[in-house]
Amino acid sequence: MVDSTLIKDSTDTSVAEPVIKPHLILALDYGVKKMGMALGNSLTETARAFDILAMNNGQPDWDNLLGIIKVWGVAKVVVGLPLNMDGSSSMLSKRAHKFARRLAHRIMEQHLPVIVSLCDERLTSVAAREIAWENGWIKHERAPIDDISACILMSTYFADPHSSIAIDAIKAD
């Protein structure tokens, strides 16, 4: 005997709820000398420090970065935008924006289904250093905290994902 509650009525025109598929997000704390990385899970809205990449005057090892995106199956990259406290652009924020455009362009060239966006990262480094000190993760003032900053950037993104700005790869330099 078949349970009639399991049979869909052909006159039922309701649309099923869309299934939200969890995906990985890569947060990048952009810098001229180094770039912090964190991986976030869209379902649990949690992030983990991942790595710190060496930068050559603001340029990463593109093959390495794109390889990380491919291997981990990243669906979105969030690049930190270091604005001034009054919200105006800084020299570094202009470079971060240019980096994000270049990244989007390279991702497009690789035919990867990855979205690149920018997210305000004001005070992430200050918060990261404070958290690292409190937890004993660093022992001296100059210890690298870029990956922790990327985690905080990811938390900022999860708190308000609609505040990020999507990057158009067509405008890449």
From Swiss-Prot:
Q: Which UniProt keywords apply?
A: Cytoplasm, Hydrolase, Nuclease, Ribosome biogenesis
Q: Which GO terms describe its biological process?
A: rRNA 5'-end processing
Q: Name one GO molecular function term.
A: nuclease activity
Q: Which CDD domains match?
A: YqgF
**Cross-referenced SUPFAM superfamilies, in alphabetical order?**
Ribonuclease H-like
What domain of life does the UniProt record list for this protein's source?
Answer: Bacteria
Q: Does the keyword Nuclease apply?
A: yes
The protein's matches in PANTHER family, at most eight in alphabetical order, are given as:
POLYNUCLEOTIDYL TRANSFERASE, RIBONUCLEASE H-LIKE SUPERFAMILY PROTEIN (PTHR33317:SF4)
Family to which the UniProt record says this protein belongs: Belongs to the YqgF nuclease family.
Chain's role: Could be a nuclease involved in processing of the 5'-end of pre-16S rRNA.
Q: Quote the HAMAP family the UniProt record gives.
A: Nuclease_YqgF (MF_00651)
Kindly provide the name given to this protein in its UniProt entry.
Putative pre-16S rRNA nuclease
- What is the protein's species of origin? Psychrobacter cryohalolentis (strain ATCC BAA-1226 / DSM 17306 / VKM B-2378 / K5)
